[in-house]
Amino acid sequence: MGNGCFHYLYIMTMDNLFLMGFFQKTWEWLDTLDRQLFLLVNGSWTHPWFDTILPIWREANTWLPLYLFLMLLVVINFPSKAISWILTAIITFAISDQVSSSLFKPFFARLRPCNEPELVGMVRLLLPNCGSGYSFTSSHATNHFAFSVFVFLTMGRVLGQWKWVFLFWAASVAYAQVYVGVHYPIDVLCGAILGTLIGWATATIYHQRFQSLTLDSKYSSK
């Protein structure tokens, strides 16, 4: 019986070592691919026009008119629904920002490419400074996808085909984060997935909690 236990422990140990080795090699492969793709986006797939536009494109202040437009759209056309929608949109942004910045980034503690010693001299930083925060996940990608998915799901019939523009907008901001040199592609990809899940969750809760106040109700009744 002792030999049986020893054999079982041996098999379990070898299996665990195999899995650890597999995951380590997989991560090393992904990390290498991630860095190579980053260098292509940041260093090869460039254009002077993008060098000027994308640093501005990614700035939150650039999009204040868009946020104000959406708020006015809701307030003017759906006054009884405005407060609940605006508050939920703000909560969506707050959750996505805190999950990305306060949970994921400290836990993974991945250096930004512009702070990575192995990439010194290889990164084109198009911002005044790299920033002291960590890289994974991209809060820009998380926040913009969370907000865009929330808008997409709660205002889809109001916006019509324009709802797709919000997803493209979020993707372009995420891409800009790689282009300007502050995030890896995996950072923005995972941030986009995380933001999508958060936006879907808050939109679902909004519909369940304020079913009679859904922005789409005015149009679906016609």
Where are the regions that the model predicts?
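Membrane-interface junctions
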Residues: 43-47, 59-63, 80, 144, ...
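Membrane-helix interface segments
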Residues: 49, 79-85, 157-164
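Interfacial segments of alpha-helical transmembrane regions
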Residues: 71-100
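N-terminal transmembrane-helix/juxtamembrane module of multi-pass inner/ER membrane proteins
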Residues: 3-67, 100-131, 217-222
